[in-house]
Amino acid sequence: MAAGPRTSMLLAFALLCLPWTQEVGAFPAMPLSSLFANAVLRAQHLHQLAADTYKEFERAYIPEGQRYSIQNAQAAFCFSETIPAPTGKDEAQQRSDVELLRFSLLLIQSWLGPVQFLSRVFTNSLVFGTSDRVYEKLKDLEEGIQALMRELEDGSPRAGQILKQTYDKFDTNMRSDDALLKNYGLLSCFKKDLHKAETYLRVMKCRRFVESSCAF
């Protein structure tokens, strides 16, 4: 009975270690189903990492009585709220795969700059020990999304057609209340944006490859 979950975990780990299809000379082309499975696993991992980091930051720096009011004030703070991206699964299902990939790429690229400051801000290795690897994980997911775009668009992704935007960098002055609130807001947006990217990828994967695990 224990073999099933263990096999699934080993398969998930193996997929996370797979290269993307850019190394054409060294590896054969990866099936589209594997590209989607790989991207979904990476997005899930990043979303969980973002959620855990947000929760630990909140626990360490934000008094419990202030959290709800601060979260409400930050509702319109995220850049992703200013673009016509789907806000949930139902809306995502109304968009084409190419549209969803472009929105996913935009969300990922908007964080490539800011997350490079994570390891400077969150120096507690017990709480934020993986923060210095977030950039590499985002770059890896970016490559995976671009590989999917090449497959579905039958050519190179037209990145120039996407309005590129980025968030402010994280503030390293953790003794300032303003800096704490800014970083809290950024982490909230990071978690929200990674959840959107994960949702888009899962919607695409499920409608292309019917699975029993599509409910989410």
Curated annotation (Swiss-Prot):
Residues in coiled coil: none
Secretion signal, residue range per the UniProt entry: 1-26
List of residues binding Zn(2+): 45, 198
Disulfide bonds: 78-189, 206-214
InterPro entries the UniProt entry points to: 4_helix_cytokine-like_core, Somatotropin, Somatotropin/Prolactin, Somatotropin_CS
Xref: PROSITE patterns: SOMATOTROPIN_1, SOMATOTROPIN_2
GO CC annotation: extracellular space
Domain of life according to the entry: Eukaryota
Keyword Cytoplasm attached: no
UniProt GO MF annotations: growth factor activity; growth hormone receptor binding; hormone activity; metal ion binding
Pfam families: Hormone_1
Record keywords: Disulfide bond, Hormone, Metal-binding, Phosphoprotein, Secreted, Signal, Zinc
Gene3D superfamilies: 1.20.1250.10
Family: Belongs to the somatotropin/prolactin family.
Name by which UniProt lists this protein: Somatotropin
